[in-house]
Protein backbone atom coordinates (compact mmCIF):
# COMPACT_ATOMS: atom_id res chain seq x y z
CA UNK A 1 0.00 0.00 0.00
CA UNK A 2 1.34 3.41 -1.01
CA UNK A 3 0.11 6.56 0.71
CA UNK A 4 0.59 10.02 -0.77
CA UNK A 5 -0.10 13.00 1.47
CA UNK A 6 -1.08 16.25 -0.19
CA UNK A 7 -1.51 19.77 1.14
CA UNK A 8 -5.14 20.16 0.14
CA UNK A 9 -8.04 18.96 -2.02
CA UNK A 10 -6.68 20.62 -5.16
CA UNK A 11 -3.34 18.86 -4.84
CA UNK A 12 -5.07 15.56 -4.03
CA UNK A 13 -7.16 15.88 -7.17
CA UNK A 14 -4.11 16.63 -9.31
CA UNK A 15 -2.19 13.65 -7.91
CA UNK A 16 -5.13 11.28 -8.47
CA UNK A 17 -5.64 12.60 -12.00
CA UNK A 18 -1.93 12.05 -12.69
CA UNK A 19 -2.23 8.40 -11.69
CA UNK A 20 -5.32 7.88 -13.85
CA UNK A 21 -3.83 9.72 -16.82
CA UNK A 22 -0.66 7.62 -16.62
CA UNK A 23 -2.84 4.53 -16.97
CA UNK A 24 -4.56 6.01 -20.04
CA UNK A 25 -1.24 6.94 -21.66
CA UNK A 26 0.37 3.55 -20.96
CA UNK A 27 -2.69 1.60 -22.11
CA UNK A 28 -4.99 3.69 -24.35
CA UNK A 29 -7.74 1.02 -24.28
CA UNK A 30 -7.61 0.58 -20.51
CA UNK A 31 -10.65 -0.12 -18.33
CA UNK A 32 -11.18 2.57 -15.71
CA UNK A 33 -13.42 1.86 -12.73
CA UNK A 34 -15.02 5.17 -11.76
CA UNK A 35 -16.75 6.60 -8.70
CA UNK A 36 -19.18 9.42 -8.01
CA UNK A 37 -19.77 11.86 -5.16
CA UNK A 38 -18.11 15.15 -4.31
CA UNK A 39 -14.59 13.77 -3.75
CA UNK A 40 -13.69 12.82 -7.36
CA UNK A 41 -15.10 15.96 -9.02
CA UNK A 42 -11.75 17.76 -8.82
CA UNK A 43 -10.00 14.71 -10.27
CA UNK A 44 -12.38 14.64 -13.22
CA UNK A 45 -11.93 18.38 -13.73
CA UNK A 46 -8.16 17.86 -14.02
CA UNK A 47 -8.60 15.05 -16.56
CA UNK A 48 -10.86 17.31 -18.62
CA UNK A 49 -8.33 20.16 -18.39
CA UNK A 50 -5.53 17.95 -19.69
CA UNK A 51 -7.76 16.56 -22.44
CA UNK A 52 -8.58 20.11 -23.56
CA UNK A 53 -4.85 20.89 -23.70
CA UNK A 54 -4.32 17.89 -25.97
CA UNK A 55 -2.40 15.88 -23.37
CA UNK A 56 -4.97 13.08 -23.00
CA UNK A 57 -7.01 11.01 -25.43
CA UNK A 58 -10.01 9.01 -24.21
CA UNK A 59 -11.10 7.62 -27.57
CA UNK A 60 -10.26 4.00 -26.75
CA UNK A 61 -10.78 4.15 -22.98
CA UNK A 62 -13.49 1.96 -21.46
CA UNK A 63 -15.19 2.67 -18.15
CA UNK A 64 -17.31 0.85 -15.60
CA UNK A 65 -18.95 2.70 -12.76
CA UNK A 66 -19.00 1.48 -9.20
CA UNK A 67 -22.70 1.91 -8.50
CA UNK A 68 -26.08 3.39 -9.43
CA UNK A 69 -29.39 4.04 -7.73
CA UNK A 70 -32.11 1.55 -8.60
CA UNK A 71 -35.26 3.14 -10.00
CA UNK A 72 -33.76 6.39 -11.31
CA UNK A 73 -33.91 7.08 -15.03
CA UNK A 74 -30.70 8.16 -16.73
CA UNK A 75 -32.00 11.69 -17.29
CA UNK A 76 -32.63 12.14 -13.56
CA UNK A 77 -30.04 14.63 -12.34
CA UNK A 78 -29.45 12.53 -9.21
CA UNK A 79 -28.54 9.40 -11.15
CA UNK A 80 -24.88 8.46 -11.33
CA UNK A 81 -25.24 8.10 -15.11
CA UNK A 82 -26.17 11.80 -15.22
CA UNK A 83 -23.32 12.70 -12.84
CA UNK A 84 -20.70 10.95 -14.98
CA UNK A 85 -21.87 12.62 -18.17
CA UNK A 86 -21.97 16.02 -16.48
CA UNK A 87 -18.51 15.79 -14.91
CA UNK A 88 -16.53 13.70 -17.39
CA UNK A 89 -18.08 11.79 -20.30
CA UNK A 90 -19.65 14.77 -22.09
CA UNK A 91 -16.46 16.82 -21.66
CA UNK A 92 -13.94 14.47 -23.28
CA UNK A 93 -13.78 12.39 -26.47
CA UNK A 94 -14.74 9.07 -24.90
CA UNK A 95 -16.99 6.81 -27.02
CA UNK A 96 -20.40 6.60 -25.26
CA UNK A 97 -20.49 2.92 -26.24
CA UNK A 98 -17.43 2.39 -24.04
CA UNK A 99 -18.99 3.90 -20.88
CA UNK A 100 -20.89 1.61 -18.54
CA UNK A 101 -23.07 2.37 -15.53
CA UNK A 102 -25.50 -0.13 -13.97
CA UNK A 103 -28.97 0.22 -15.48
CA UNK A 104 -31.11 1.64 -12.71
CA UNK A 105 -34.37 0.98 -14.54
CA UNK A 106 -33.89 -2.75 -15.22
CA UNK A 107 -36.86 -4.40 -13.45
CA UNK A 108 -35.01 -7.66 -12.82
CA UNK A 109 -32.32 -6.86 -10.24
CA UNK A 110 -30.66 -10.28 -10.36
CA UNK A 111 -30.47 -10.11 -14.14
CA UNK A 112 -28.82 -6.67 -14.06
CA UNK A 113 -26.27 -7.72 -11.43
CA UNK A 114 -25.32 -10.80 -13.44
CA UNK A 115 -25.10 -8.75 -16.66
CA UNK A 116 -22.84 -6.15 -15.08
CA UNK A 117 -20.53 -8.68 -13.48
CA UNK A 118 -20.17 -10.57 -16.79
CA UNK A 119 -19.56 -7.28 -18.60
CA UNK A 120 -16.61 -6.48 -16.33
CA UNK A 121 -15.21 -9.99 -16.87
CA UNK A 122 -15.64 -9.71 -20.65
CA UNK A 123 -13.58 -6.50 -20.65
CA UNK A 124 -10.70 -8.31 -19.00
CA UNK A 125 -11.35 -6.77 -15.61
CA UNK A 126 -10.70 -3.28 -14.29
CA UNK A 127 -7.19 -1.86 -14.75
CA UNK A 128 -7.56 0.80 -12.08
CA UNK A 129 -10.52 1.36 -9.76
CA UNK A 130 -11.13 4.82 -8.30
CA UNK A 131 -12.74 4.79 -4.85
CA UNK A 132 -13.88 7.24 -2.23
CA UNK A 133 -14.27 6.36 1.45
CA UNK A 134 -17.45 6.63 3.51
CA UNK A 135 -17.46 7.88 7.11
CA UNK A 136 -18.20 4.33 8.30
CA UNK A 137 -15.65 2.75 5.96
CA UNK A 138 -18.05 1.87 3.18
CA UNK A 139 -16.81 1.60 -0.41
CA UNK A 140 -19.44 1.85 -3.11
CA UNK A 141 -22.67 0.89 -1.38
CA UNK A 142 -20.93 -1.90 0.54
CA UNK A 143 -21.92 -0.97 4.07
CA UNK A 144 -20.45 -2.44 7.29
CA UNK A 145 -20.77 -6.22 7.56
CA UNK A 146 -20.93 -6.71 3.77
CA UNK A 147 -19.46 -10.03 2.68
CA UNK A 148 -15.92 -9.63 1.35
CA UNK A 149 -16.51 -12.14 -1.48
CA UNK A 150 -19.68 -10.52 -2.79
CA UNK A 151 -19.95 -9.60 -6.47
CA UNK A 152 -22.21 -6.96 -8.08
CA UNK A 153 -25.49 -6.92 -6.19
CA UNK A 154 -28.55 -4.86 -5.30
CA UNK A 155 -28.62 -3.40 -1.79
CA UNK A 156 -31.29 -1.84 0.40
CA UNK A 157 -30.08 1.61 1.35
CA UNK A 158 -29.69 2.36 5.04
CA UNK A 159 -32.12 4.75 6.70
CA UNK A 160 -29.26 7.19 7.30
CA UNK A 161 -28.41 7.20 3.57
CA UNK A 162 -32.06 7.69 2.61
CA UNK A 163 -32.39 10.50 5.15
CA UNK A 164 -29.22 12.20 3.88
CA UNK A 165 -30.46 12.02 0.29
CA UNK A 166 -33.83 13.64 0.96
CA UNK A 167 -32.42 17.12 0.38
CA UNK A 168 -31.66 16.21 -3.25
CA UNK A 169 -35.23 15.23 -4.13
CA UNK A 170 -38.52 17.13 -4.41
CA UNK A 171 -40.33 14.58 -2.27
CA UNK A 172 -39.26 11.96 0.27
CA UNK A 173 -41.16 9.43 -1.85
CA UNK A 174 -38.74 10.08 -4.74
CA UNK A 175 -35.64 9.06 -2.77
CA UNK A 176 -34.30 5.69 -3.99
CA UNK A 177 -34.51 2.84 -1.52
CA UNK A 178 -32.10 0.54 -3.34
CA UNK A 179 -28.89 0.72 -5.36
CA UNK A 180 -26.70 -1.49 -7.51
CA UNK A 181 -23.08 -1.72 -6.46
CA UNK A 182 -19.97 -3.64 -7.37
CA UNK A 183 -19.35 -6.02 -4.49
CA UNK A 184 -16.17 -6.00 -2.47
CA UNK A 185 -15.12 -9.16 -4.31
CA UNK A 186 -15.53 -7.33 -7.63
CA UNK A 187 -13.58 -4.31 -6.37
CA UNK A 188 -10.76 -6.50 -5.07
CA UNK A 189 -10.29 -8.06 -8.51
CA UNK A 190 -9.25 -4.70 -9.98
CA UNK A 191 -5.58 -4.76 -10.93
CA UNK A 192 -4.92 -1.47 -9.12
CA UNK A 193 -6.99 0.52 -6.65
CA UNK A 194 -6.78 4.29 -6.20
CA UNK A 195 -8.57 5.61 -3.12
CA UNK A 196 -8.92 9.34 -2.62
CA UNK A 197 -9.92 11.00 0.63
CA UNK A 198 -9.96 14.53 2.00
CA UNK A 199 -11.02 16.46 5.04
CA UNK A 200 -10.62 16.14 8.80
CA UNK A 201 -13.97 14.35 9.07
CA UNK A 202 -12.40 11.31 7.40
CA UNK A 203 -9.28 11.16 9.61
CA UNK A 204 -10.63 8.61 12.10
CA UNK A 205 -11.93 6.18 9.48
CA UNK A 206 -8.72 6.40 7.42
CA UNK A 207 -6.69 5.30 10.46
CA UNK A 208 -9.22 2.60 11.35
CA UNK A 209 -9.57 1.22 7.81
CA UNK A 210 -5.92 1.09 6.85
CA UNK A 211 -4.11 0.64 10.16
CA UNK A 212 -6.68 -1.35 12.13
CA UNK A 213 -7.82 -4.97 11.81
CA UNK A 214 -9.25 -6.30 8.55
CA UNK A 215 -12.92 -6.79 9.36
CA UNK A 216 -16.28 -6.68 7.55
CA UNK A 217 -17.30 -4.06 10.13
CA UNK A 218 -15.01 -1.69 8.20
CA UNK A 219 -15.47 -2.67 4.53
CA UNK A 220 -12.50 -0.63 3.24
CA UNK A 221 -10.15 -2.51 5.59
CA UNK A 222 -10.05 -5.39 3.07
CA UNK A 223 -7.99 -3.13 0.80
CA UNK A 224 -5.04 -3.82 3.11
CA UNK A 225 -4.89 -7.26 1.47
CA UNK A 226 -4.83 -6.00 -2.13
CA UNK A 227 -1.38 -6.07 -3.72
CA UNK A 228 -1.58 -2.67 -5.47
CA UNK A 229 -3.39 0.05 -3.55
CA UNK A 230 -2.60 3.76 -3.70
CA UNK A 231 -4.18 6.14 -1.21
CA UNK A 232 -4.07 9.85 -1.99
CA UNK A 233 -5.27 12.05 0.85
CA UNK A 234 -4.86 15.58 2.07
CA UNK A 235 -3.11 16.39 5.35
CA UNK A 236 -6.37 16.64 7.26
CA UNK A 237 -7.62 13.21 6.18
CA UNK A 238 -4.27 11.58 6.95
CA UNK A 239 -3.70 13.42 10.24
CA UNK A 240 -4.36 10.39 12.47
CA UNK A 241 -2.41 7.66 10.71
CA UNK A 242 0.61 6.19 12.55
CA UNK A 243 3.89 7.92 11.71
Enumerate the predicted regions with their spans.
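Conserved phosphate- and dinucleotide-binding cores of soluble alpha/beta proteins
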Residues: 4, 72-78, 82-86, 90-243
